A protein has these predicted regions:
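Non-catalytic accessory segments flanking P-loop/AAA+ NTPase cores
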Residues: 1-581
């Protein structure tokens, strides 16, 4: 087959003419392209890309254990999956960083192998959620796509190379950054060619083959053939530079992660194992559950499932996720950062209603979700079905607090009537306060149990008091634990800034002791105090006394405790008596 010649004209007028002819054929009518008359610049930029190709190094230094600890805050179970994903992803990007740091001093390996990842597991167990969390944490460009939306070039559907172009957009047109991104393709099992299906095989196999080179290493042209926008960009670039712009992305460092439910793969594995075992061993194979069989997956099983051997060969890392039990679903609901409860809190918060769930209620929701047999997705359905009537009625009444109890889930209509009766307001208020106290204690314990990680991450010493304050702030505001800790850290830093302001404005060196900082954090969080208010009180309550001591003794450094802030007169009298008399 002869290689196509590049017939794109270099003359702007010819480009303009061809673009006009293309648009006429495409849209009909007389379409005329009018471009500004701009002469090419005197200097030529041979091969210079139209998009940015920054030389900044990738800033990645996360260790696998750090990423696992982060995922543990959001994902229940999946210990093996979190380990595999964290290790291989961190190694991939740290290897890129190390290579860029070494520069030319590190020779490139011929036949470099990427650790592309294949994730297998039933629907609703958190495959997509895991990858989204990782992408958010590591901060590299990330693109997610559905395998069923793509086709081999020439068939109906998206071109797989569009994924690379989308990655460049996510990187704000920084090609070098895009070359260190992640492409995640879900429902990859849907492009496996099935022996029992006739007709769709060519397209499915074609998509697999189209992915082969990008998954390994290839250069992808960002310009799309026969695309009017690309042609206009070509014209604009030529008019500015006098040269054709090269817009090429190399995929050697782009990590591909694919996932699927693979619902029929267990049967393929069972047949293979049955052939290898006869008699009693064969009966044991038949009794194995689907998830147990998936953990025995081999390359030949995936080939028999309908994948090309070359395609599977480019996915050397396999990650099998566990199915979720009823207890796992309950644990998900108990996690502070779980999106199911946070989302429902946001729903009611939109009407200025604070909602809280008792432990018994969460267990019932988990049981109902497990019966749905759709994994963690069943949690959303169970909560929506249980609370829809309350979400409809409560916004129309003057009610600002709502507690989801076991009784409410078992008798929603009766409880709704009881809840709306004004005579029962105090009863439900007490139920809410009790549930809030229990939830706050649970969150505080969670923070305290993980305070070593949180303290390092936020640069904040977490005493029991600060754990309690963070927990209360989290309970009263819809946010993740990390955001609540960031708020406490921000307030803590603003208090330390007050010390600097006092020194700068009044030439007094005051130092807040830890209990004083905790007291001030509480004022900021619960009473909306401001830096200026605190600064003014420091001047009004302490300046004259501190200034007197400084004039008499030369001392200009003073420590303020919580008691000193609460009872400034007693504190100053004792201090003056001690320092002067």
């Amino acid at each position: 087959m002869k290689k196509e010649k590049n017939n794109i004209p270099h003359d702007p007028k010819k480009i303009e003419k061809e673009l006009g002819e293309f648009l006429n054929k495409k849209f009909g009518g007389n379409v005329k392209i009018i471009t500004p008359s701009v002469l090419p610049q005197q200097e030529t930029f041979s091969g210079k890309p139209f998009l940015k190709k920054n030389k900044s190094l990738i800033n990645f230094n996360i260790k696998p254990s750090e990423l696992i600890a982060y995922l543990d805050q959001y994902v229940v179970k999946q210990i093996k999956a979190k380990s595999v994903l964290s290790t291989k992803i961190c190694t991939h990007f740290n290897r890129i960083r190390h290579s860029q740091t070494m520069g030319n001093g590190l020779s490139k390996i011929t036949g470099n192998i990427k650790s592309n990842i294949l994730m297998l597991g039933p629907t609703g167990i958190g495959k997509t959620y895991l990858i989204k969390l990782i992408a958010k944490k590591i901060g590299v460009p990330f693109v997610k796509a559905d395998a069923t939306k793509f086709s081999e070039t020439g068939y109906v559907g998206g071109d797989v190379e569009d994924l690379i172009r989308d990655l460049v957009k996510e990187a704000n047109d920084d090609i070098q950054l895009a070359e260190c991104g992640i492409i995640y393709i879900d429902e990859i099992d849907k492009i496996a060619s099935s022996p029992s299906v006739i007709g769709a095989q060519v397209s499915r196999t074609g998509v697999q083959r189209a992915l082969l080179k990008p998954m390994e290493e290839t250069d992808v042209n960002l310009k799309v053939p026969h695309d009017p926008v690309s042609m206009m960009q070509e014209l604009e670039s030529f008019q500015k530079t006098g040269k054709r712009a090269k817009q090429i992305v190399n995929t050697s460092n782009i990590l591909f992660i694919v996932s699927g439910a693979f619902s029929e793969l267990s049967n393929v594995i069972r047949r293979r194992l049955s052939r290898q075992n006869i008699g009693f061993g064969s009966k044991l194979v038949q009794s194995k559950k689907e998830n147990e069989l998936l953990k025995l997956t081999k390359a030949e099983d995936l080939v028999n499932f309908g994948f090309e051997s070359e395609f599977i060969g480019r996915l050397p890392v396999r990650c099998i996720l566990d199915t979720l039990t009823q207890e796992d679903l309950y644990s998900i609901l108990k996690m502070p950062n779980n999106p199911v409860i946070l989302s429902k809190r946001l729903d009611f918060n939109a009407y200025d209603i604070k909602i809280i769930f008792t432990d018994e209620a969460l267990k019932i929701i988990a049981k109902r979700a497990y019966e749905e047999n759709t994994g963690a997705r069943g949690l959303v359905s169970a909560i929506e079905e249980a609370l829809l009537d309350f979400e409809e009625k409560l916004p129309s009444h003057d009610l600002l607090k709502f507690t989801v109890t076991k009784k409410i889930l078992e008798d929603p209509k009766g409880c709704l009537i009881d809840f709306l009766a004004k005579k029962n307001a105090l009863k439900w208020e007490n139920i809410y306060e009790k549930a809030l106290l229990n939830y706050k204690d649970y969150i505080s314990k969670y923070i305290n149990d993980n305070k070593k990680i949180f303290s390092i991450r936020h640069g904040l010493t977490l005493s029991q008091i600060r754990c309690d304050m963070t927990a209360l702030y989290f309970c009263n505001n819809v946010m993740e634990i990390e955001d609540a800790l960031s708020k406490i850290k921000k307030v803590h830093d603003s208090i330390k800034e007050i010390e600097i302001e006092v020194l700068k404005n009044y030439n007094l060196n005051i130092i807040f002791e830890e209990d004083a900082i905790d007291f001030l954090i509480e004022q900021f969080i619960n009473h909306n105090a401001t830096n200026q208010e605190i600064l003014s009180k420091i001047y009004d309550n302490y300046y004259n006394g501190f200034n007197l001591i400084r004039e008499k003794t030369g001392k200009d450094r003073f420590f303020l405790s919580k008691n000193a802030l609460i009872d400034n007169e007693t504190y100053l009298n004792d201090l003056i008596r001690k320092e002067i008399t």
